[in-house]
Amino acid sequence: MSSIETYMQSVGEQARTASRAMMRATGAAKNQALLAMAEAILAQRAELQAANAKDVAAARANGLEAALLDRLTLSDRSIALMAEGLRQIAALPDPVGSITATSVRPNGMRVAQMRVPLGVIGIIYESRPNVTIDAAALCLKSGNATILRGGSEALHSNVALGRIVQAGLQAAGLPTAAVQVIDTTDRAAVGKLVTMTEHVDVIVPRGGKGLISRLAQEARVPLIKHLDGNCHVYVDAAADLAKAHDIAFNAKTYRYGVCGAMETLLVHADVAQRLLPVLGQALHEHGVELRGCARALQWLPEGKPADDADWATEYLGPVLAVRVVDTIDEAMDHIARWGSGHTDAIVTENLSAAQRFQREVDSSSVYVNLPTCFADGFEYGLGAEIGISTNRLHARGPVGLEGLTTLKWVLNGEGQVRG
């Protein structure tokens, strides 16, 4: 067994032991740990920024692009936001131990389901050290142990944050091994983490398509994941065009790099001539490159011809594919063929069309008269999220505290026997 395998085996064993203690942890103890972490992050800002400066300097020397450097940097504001996020998670209801679906059987036996932690969660992520705090806090609050493996470019930052997290756990009388940060940049650690089925119950990858595709191929531990956010807005024949304009513009331009950004606009032929010239001009003036089908280009003079690659692409940038369709069926067929199952929306004043779209479009979130950029756990009232899942099993859509738990059946009786 290599040194990395030995190290990861030890981490996994400690996490499994800690997970049993976390199942018993009280809500008060978990909140105490979270609030202690929030205070320590602010009190140790200088130390955190000194560690972060090492990562930023190395990343700059290695030519990391400006956008990724910005994500990597722990500014005063980002540190304050991490502390505030910890306080917000502490204020959320504790899902562990809640009872649902209670019923009484004819023989008087009481049947219910209890929400319990998943166990040990591995989180694999890139660039952003704030994920260390977000992930640790959500896993802690939901009663799980977690193993965190951040990007190599953020190693010093993540290790420093990990020390703060473990000090908070210790102050609350909780096992420090409930949150462990992998302190090696060796990629073999990731390969080992995603195959440790005896110690890890689920993996949550947060990163680019390349990372998630690799993990999906290598993992023996189940993944909560999404590969792409190829999101659509369909403007129906019965749409309010003022609403449609604002929804489509917001869905594309709110933030280009989020997984809920609209990447393809589908417009019914009956309204294309009235909507596309005005909307296309607004998007063009905002710096968005338009790529359309032949029919759409009639009303998009600045547009370029689209091909199949455009329908399949999550641009994560100022590019939008546009297609004119003749029916809602054609729109839904397009989404079924090219979509990623993330978030899709219809703009319509026709109730039956809205209901049909929500029923038949097989995505983790389906909206009526809303932009796709609302795909976010905070906007859903979850308080915070670990990521967005397009899986069909277990969690689907934004994954908050409840998505990091599962259900077990609990039955109570008075001595009944089965005849």
Swiss-Prot record:
Gene3D superfamilies attached to this UniProt entry: Aldehyde Dehydrogenase, Chain A, domain 1, Aldehyde Dehydrogenase, Chain A, domain 2
GO molecular function: glutamate-5-semialdehyde dehydrogenase activity; NADP binding
Family, similarity comment: Belongs to the gamma-glutamyl phosphate reductase family.
Entry keywords, A to Z: Amino-acid biosynthesis, Cytoplasm, NADP, Oxidoreductase, Proline biosynthesis
PROSITE patterns associated with the record: PROA
Biological role stated in the UniProt entry: Catalyzes the NADPH-dependent reduction of L-glutamate 5-phosphate into L-glutamate 5-semialdehyde and phosphate. The product spontaneously undergoes cyclization to form 1-pyrroline-5-carboxylate.
EC numbers on record: 1.2.1.41
Compartment(s) of residence: Cytoplasm
PANTHER family: DELTA-1-PYRROLINE-5-CARBOXYLATE SYNTHASE, GLUTAMATE SEMIALDEHYDE DEHYDROGENASE
Associated pathway: Amino-acid biosynthesis; L-proline biosynthesis; L-glutamate 5-semialdehyde from L-glutamate: step 2/2
This protein's name: Gamma-glutamyl phosphate reductase
Recorded name of the encoding gene: proA
Reactions catalysed, as given in the entry: L-glutamate 5-semialdehyde + phosphate + NADP(+) = L-glutamyl 5-phosphate + NADPH + H(+)
HAMAP family: ProA
Any one GO CC term of the record: cytoplasm
Keyword Lyase included in the entry's annotation: no
Origin superkingdom: Bacteria
Cited InterPro entries: Ald_DH/histidinol_DH, Ald_DH_C, Ald_DH_N, Aldehyde_DH_dom, G-glutamylP_reductase_CS, Glu-5-SA_DH, GPR_dom
UniProt record, GO biological process: L-proline biosynthetic process
Keyword set includes Amino-acid biosynthesis: yes
